[in-house]
């Protein structure tokens, strides 16, 4: 699990929303899911994750309830709200458009100009 890739501003929230969209998770589970879906390219520090989770919950993008984790410990499980699903869709569309534009720009050749 390397941290070779750096997070761009605003991407942590998007990654959290995506991770939770795949199923309810507790905080540590979200860290592991982000590592998994990024092919172990991204490692999120707990010190960054938990303030982001609190912020997303305050914004109404995540809902949380207490439950029992797989190792029988009390944990707060997060799930997407309807507003969270909308935000994820909007942010995903925006990033996909940006990737398309940047790919075209970076692949430009003198012959195309």
Provide a role label for each language-model segment:
Residues 57-74, 79:
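Beta-hairpin "wing" of winged helix-turn-helix
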Residues 80-84:
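Accessory beta->alpha helical hairpin/"wing" motif in late/C-terminal subdomains of nucleic-acid enzymes
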Residues 2-6, 66-67:
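Short beta-strand/turn micro-motifs at beta-sheet edges
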Residues 86-113:
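Amphipathic alpha-helical dimerization/coiled-coil segments
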Residues 11, 15, 75, 79, ...:
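Amphipathic alpha-helical recognition patches that constitute DNA-binding helices
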Residues 4-48:
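N-terminal helix-turn-helix DNA-binding core of bacterial DNA-binding proteins
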Residues 49-56:
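Basic amphipathic alpha-helical segments that dock to polyanions
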């Amino acid at each position: 699990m390397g941290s070779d890739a750096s997070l761009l501003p605003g991407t942590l929230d998007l990654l959290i929303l995506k991770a939770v969209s795949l199923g309810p998770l507790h905080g540590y589970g979200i860290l592991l899911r982000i590592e998994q879906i990024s092919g172990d390219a991204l490692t999120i520090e707990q010190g960054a994750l938990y303030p982001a989770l609190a912020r997303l919950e305050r914004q109404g993008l995540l809902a949380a309830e207490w439950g029992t984790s797989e190792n029988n410990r009390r944990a707060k499980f997060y799930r997407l709200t309807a507003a969270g699903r909308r935000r994820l869709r909007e942010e995903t569309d925006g990033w996909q458009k940006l990737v398309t534009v940047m790919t075209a720009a970076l692949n430009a050749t003198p012959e195309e100009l």
